Amino acid sequence: MSNEPPPPYPGGPTAPLLEEKSGAPHTPGRTSPAVMQPPPGMPLPSADIAPPPYEPPGHPVPQPGFVPPHMNADGTYMPAGFYPPPGPHPPMGYYPPGPYPPGSYPGPGGHTATVLVPSGAATTVTVLQGEIFEGAPVQTVCPHCQQAITTKISYEIGLMNFVLGFFCCFMGCDLGCCLIPCLINDFKDVTHTCPSCKAYICTYKRLC
């Protein structure tokens, strides 16, 4: 046999590396990153151009003449669910001054009471709170002398006495029995007068 070394192998160390011919070798399971290339004719973006800074979303710009439901008139915002406290209310029984017609004032419960102003006493106003005059004395204010009084009552023969008298005659009561209803005060009309000035106030009629 010859002692000469064998010829070099074509794929041996003297052959150019595969990476120099076609780049890095392909590794299974690994993909090279894709590079976005601009279309032909469009210049590349400059590296100095940065995206616009991020701005947090602010309040929408209202249209002229529109006030959002949570915005005050001066442009400040109120938190949701906030309601202004109610204004002061007048105490119970207080009636604010107003243009009421002469001769009447608002009474309790929304009723209108009658005002009696005697001649010569323009500075004194008497309000009668709708007293009910019946067959018993009533505490009231005299519209004539302007004093707090209890009325004085007197009985007078009225329509009910005559009706009951004719009814007795129809039933056959004679010899003066038909006059018995005229003697009973519970069937007579009641007249209320002032015990101080003796002035007439009201008459309660049993039968109108």
Curated annotation (Swiss-Prot):
InterPro entries in the record: LITAF (IPR006629), LITAF_fam (IPR037519)
Membrane topology qualifier: Peripheral membrane protein
Domain commentary: The LITAF domain is stabilized by a bound zinc ion. The LITAF domain contains an amphipathic helix that mediates interaction with lipid membranes.
GO cellular component, one term: cytoplasmic side of lysosomal membrane
Pfam families hit by this protein: zf-LITAF-like
Binding site for Zn(2+): C142, C145, C194, C197
Residue segments, region Disordered: 1-70
Region ranges (Membrane-binding amphipathic helix): 164-184
Protein's UniProt name: Cell death-inducing p53-target protein 1
Lineage: Eukaryota, Metazoa, Chordata, Craniata, Vertebrata
PANTHER family documented for this protein: CELL DEATH-INDUCING P53-TARGET PROTEIN 1 (PTHR23292:SF7), LIPOPOLYSACCHARIDE-INDUCED TUMOR NECROSIS FACTOR-ALPHA FACTOR (PTHR23292)
Ranges annotated as biased composition (Pro residues): 1-13, 50-67
BP GO terms, sorted: intrinsic apoptotic signaling pathway in response to DNA damage by p53 class mediator
Its biological purpose: Acts as an important p53/TP53-apoptotic effector. Regulates TNF-alpha-mediated apoptosis in a p53/TP53-dependent manner.
Keyword presence, Secreted: no
Places the protein is found: Late endosome membrane; Lysosome membrane
Domain LITAF, residue spans: 122-206
GO function terms (MF aspect): zinc ion binding
SMART domains in alphabetical order: LITAF (SM00714)
Keyword tags: Apoptosis, Endosome, Lysosome, Membrane, Metal-binding, Zinc
Family per record: Belongs to the CDIP1/LITAF family.
